[in-house]
């Protein structure tokens, strides 16, 4: 499938997995619908009842906030596994954090600056981050990008564990978080049958 179809399918799968309205008492993000938190919905101009958040609007938010902000069209052109990891990481923990972990991994993989210069860990994927990623790909090849995808994904386990250690209430979600991360690159999550119309309604 092409990159546009990959983006649409991943967004539709997240919406399907997250489901409709949820207001878990331990969720610090408050009520969600289709996985979109109240604050994110408000930030994107939605002022209605979260129970009525339109699914096409949720899809648009996922595309803009979690795909395009991380430059995942560019990254998917290099390695789709890495794009999938960063998208799911962004959805689960915020796009800024996903970008930071990518930048940290690139900095420790540059052989003390011999392969490319360190980049600023600022949580924003821009030209410096993409240039470092391209240089990493040129030097290490496809296997290097595959390794990078796995190392970023592995860091998520540590991040989620620390959340639960700091706040016992978050243990309500720990098993699900761990399972989500572990299953991601086995593509278990990406074999979910979702309605074709959900995929098609994701805006380009």
Residue ranges of predicted features:
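Cell-wall polysaccharide-cleaving catalytic domain and substrate-binding groove, primarily
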Residues: 1-204
């Amino acid at each position: 499938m092409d990159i546009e179809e990959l983006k649409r399918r991943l967004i539709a799968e997240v919406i399907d997995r997250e489901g409709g309205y949820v207001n878990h008492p331990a969720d610090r993000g408050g009520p969600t619908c289709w996985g979109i938190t109240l604050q994110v919905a408000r930030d994107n101009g939605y002022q209605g009842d979260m129970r009525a958040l339109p699914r096409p609007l949720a899809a648009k938010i996922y595309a803009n906030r979690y795909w395009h902000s991380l430059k995942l069209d560019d990254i998917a052109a290099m390695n789709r596994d890495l794009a999938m990891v960063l998208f799911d990481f962004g959805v689960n923990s915020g796009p800024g954090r996903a970008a930071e972990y990518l930048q940290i991994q690139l900095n420790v993989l540059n052989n003390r600056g011999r392969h490319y210069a360190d980049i600023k860990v600022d949580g924003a994927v821009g030209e410096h981050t993409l240039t470092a990623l391209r240089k990493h790909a040129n030097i290490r090849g496809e296997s290097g990008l595959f390794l990078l995808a796995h190392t970023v994904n592995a860091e998520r386990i540590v991040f989620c564990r620390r959340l639960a250690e700091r706040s016992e209430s978050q243990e309500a979600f720990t098993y699900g978080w761990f399972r989500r991360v572990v299953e991601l690159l086995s593509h278990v999550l990406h074999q979910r049958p979702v309605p074709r119309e959900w995929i098609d309604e994701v805006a380009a």
